């Protein structure tokens, strides 16, 4: 494996289709923080790896650069802590606009929500 792919999140760990997002959002198990909302759906026991989908609406964050930055931060938090939420499909959604200087807070909120979901489910 080359070093450029060591720190990436595999495509098998991402929700990519609308039906996959819909299934998680319909399940209605939700955890919230100040800026983020985490939707969780437990998966069958034989399907143990965790997957994540991200929603950062244009209505909330107008600039694509900022939307992509937020998604990268959340994806990195998930990559480092995905063992905590094994067997779950997650959709992380931005609730309100954030300042670029709040990167550390967004990262920490994402980690906190993942751990909170793992403890309560």
From Swiss-Prot:
GO terms for biological process: tRNA 5'-leader removal. GO terms for cellular component: ribonuclease P complex. It comes from the Bacteria. Pfam families: Ribonuclease_P (PF00825). Its EC number is 3.1.26.5. It catalyses: Endonucleolytic cleavage of RNA, removing 5'-extranucleotides from tRNA precursor. It is an enzyme of class 3 (hydrolase). The keyword Nuclease applies. One of its GO terms (molecular function) is ribonuclease P activity. Keywords: Endonuclease, Hydrolase, Nuclease, RNA-binding, tRNA processing. Consists of a catalytic RNA component (M1 or rnpB) and a protein subunit. NCBIfam families: rnpA. RNaseP catalyzes the removal of the 5'-leader sequence from pre-tRNA to produce the mature 5'-terminus. It can also cleave other RNA substrates such as 4.5S RNA. The protein component plays an auxiliary but essential role in vivo by binding to the 5'-leader sequence and broadening the substrate specificity of the ribozyme. Belongs to the RnpA family. This is Ribonuclease P protein component. The gene is rnpA.
């Amino acid at each position: 494996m080359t070093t450029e792919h060591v720190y990436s999140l595999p495509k098998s760990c991402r929700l990519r289709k609308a039906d996959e997002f819909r299934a998680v959002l319909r399940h209605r198990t939700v955890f919230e923080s100040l800026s983020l909302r985490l939707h969780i759906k437990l998966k069958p026991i034989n399907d143990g790896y965790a997957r994540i989908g991200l929603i950062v609406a244009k209505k909330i964050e107008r600039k694509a650069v900022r939307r992509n930055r937020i998604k990268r931060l959340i994806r990195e938090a998930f990559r480092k802590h995905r063992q905590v939420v094994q067997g779950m499909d997650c959709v992380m959604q931005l609730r309100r606009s954030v300042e670029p200087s709040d990167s550390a807070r967004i990262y920490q909120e994402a980690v906190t929500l993942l751990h909170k979901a793992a403890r309560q489910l």
